């Protein structure tokens, strides 16, 4: 779809673990951020449906589709090639969910090489067979950057920990806490937490996006985040974390004890507190709808913005 010009970008947990070249936490749902700025309602809906319902490699189950104003979810079925528990209550196997949202701001992005796990684990001879006989090979996908995913997870963890007494919120918080603990020592994240300019750009994007979220924390500034310490003192979060690891962190060596994860949050908090942009971040002056459509030229050192006038509309969807 990206090759055909669809402005949809890979994000979320599955994108994270594809970027890290590991499957430490089981995640195969595909989350997409779809850029619909400057689009009419009809064009918005068309882009979301195109991002979720137009794939032909797997059969789609229309009965499981969900459509909201700025979100479309589709579920595709497949037959796993390995043995699995057919009564698995979590339905982790045999179904692939694709979720596309347009309330998110699709920037910054980068090209990510993605490959199937079977390819990653194969030796050179096996890879040649996979390529020549089965067409299994790495490919490029436009993806929300690792640094932006990290910022998103900070905000998500704060929102879910604050509401951890509500059903399912503690479990969602647990997944983000685990991911943050995994990401903390990645070189790109270490650099981000020391880079005030990059931090400021990402926080401005996320704070603007937060204004549009129905289940977010639009009135909370980054320096007011409390989940770094609160998570360790909420029994429902601790319980959910242990459950999440049993269900989604399939290898024992990939599991992180809750105390170690809490310590990782403390270290993240200390590093963020030393970042001027984190401390001085302010509420955005415009909402997502006020932002003009834009294209971005990516580089290792920054993202050059080339704005378009708000009065100019995008071409109608073809």
Residue ranges of each PLM-predicted region?
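Long, low-complexity intrinsically disordered regions
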Residues: 289-304
């Amino acid at each position: 779809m990206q090759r055909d010009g669809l402005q949809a970008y890979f994000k979320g947990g599955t994108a994270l673990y594809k970027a890290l070249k590991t499957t430490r936490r089981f995640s195969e749902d595909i989350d997409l951020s779809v850029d619909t700025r400057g689009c009419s309602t009809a064009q918005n809906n068309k882009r979301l449906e195109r991002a979720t319902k137009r794939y032909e490699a797997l059969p789609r189950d229309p009965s499981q589709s969900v459509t909201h104003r700025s979100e479309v979810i589709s579920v595709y079925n497949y037959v796993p090639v390995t043995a699995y528990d057919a009564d698995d209550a979590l339905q982790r196997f045999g179904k692939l969910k694709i979720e596309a949202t347009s309330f998110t701001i699709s920037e910054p992005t980068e090209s990510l090489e993605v490959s199937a796990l079977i390819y990653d684990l194969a030796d050179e001879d096996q890879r040649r067979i996979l390529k020549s006989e089965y067409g299994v090979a790495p490919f490029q996908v436009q993806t929300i950057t690792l640094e932006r995913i990290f910022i998103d997870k900070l905000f998500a963890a704060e929102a879910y920990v604050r509401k951890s007494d509500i059903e399912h919120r503690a479990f969602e918080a647990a997944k983000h806490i685990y991911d943050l603990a995994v990401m903390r020592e990645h070189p790109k994240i270490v650099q981000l937490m020391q880079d005030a300019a990059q931090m400021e750009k990402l926080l401005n994007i996320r704070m603007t996006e937060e204004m549009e979220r129905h289940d977010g924390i639009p009135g909370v500034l980054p320096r007011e985040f409390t989940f770094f310490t609160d998570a360790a003192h909420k029994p429902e979060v601790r319980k959910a974390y242990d459950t999440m690891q049993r269900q989604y962190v399939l290898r024992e060596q990939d599991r992180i004890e809750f105390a170690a994860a809490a310590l990782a949050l403390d270290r993240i908090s200390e590093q963020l507190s030393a970042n001027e942009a984190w401390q001085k971040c302010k509420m955005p002056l415009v909402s997502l709808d006020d932002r003009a459509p834009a294209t971005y030229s990516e580089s290792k050192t920054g993202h050059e913005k080339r704005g378009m006038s708000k009065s100019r509309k995008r071409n109608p969807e073809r």
